[in-house]
């Protein structure tokens, strides 16, 4: 169980809480309120007034398919030799060690749909 206190909470539904608390148990939010007493054995985190929002969903990206260190050799999201490339699959080229994943997490992205680029008429299958 985790209690986050002193957070600027911006929920999807309901009023903004400039100095609120959020209680989560087993990975699920169980309470959001201006004040919540910490249950026994609960881990308490002081957010220090930081913004707390629901996780962001990235609906179209190429995260894990573009290795910036390799320049064009690492761009696995576009195959521009043909206009139709339905055989391309993100799962075949995704790099789970891509440094963009931790950057996205730090930015609040919790879900991402990654796949081939949009340079082709039919570009392939997203993961």
Provide a role label for each language-model segment.
Residues 9, 13-53:
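Histidine-rich, glycine-flanked metal-binding segment
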Residues 5, 25-26, 116:
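A cytosolic small-molecule/anion-sensing beta-strand core signal
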Residues 12, 91-94:
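Short gly/ser/thr-rich secondary-structure transition/capping motifs
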Residues 10, 62, 117-118:
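Catalytic metal-binding/acid-base residues of hydrolase active sites
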Residues 96-127:
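Active-site loop-helix segments enriched in His/Asp/Glu that coordinate
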Residues 18, 71-74, 127:
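Short, glycine/charged-enriched secondary-structure capping and boundary segments
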């Amino acid at each position: 169980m985790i209690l986050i206190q002193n957070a600027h909470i911006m929920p999807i539904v309901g009023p903004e809480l400039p100095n609120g608390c959020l209680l989560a148990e087993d990975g699920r939010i169980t309470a959001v309120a201006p004040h919540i007493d910490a249950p026994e054995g609960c881990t308490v985190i002081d957010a220090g007034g930081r913004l707390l929002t629901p996780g962001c969903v990235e609906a179209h990206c190429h995260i894990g398919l573009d290795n910036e260190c390799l320049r064009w050799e690492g761009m696995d999201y576009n195959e521009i030799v043909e206009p139709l490339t339905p055989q391309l699959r993100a799962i075949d080229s995704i790099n789970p060690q891509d440094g963009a994943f931790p950057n996205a997490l730090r930015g609040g992205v919790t879900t991402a749909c990654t796949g081939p680029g949009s340079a082709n008429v039919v570009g392939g299958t997203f993961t």
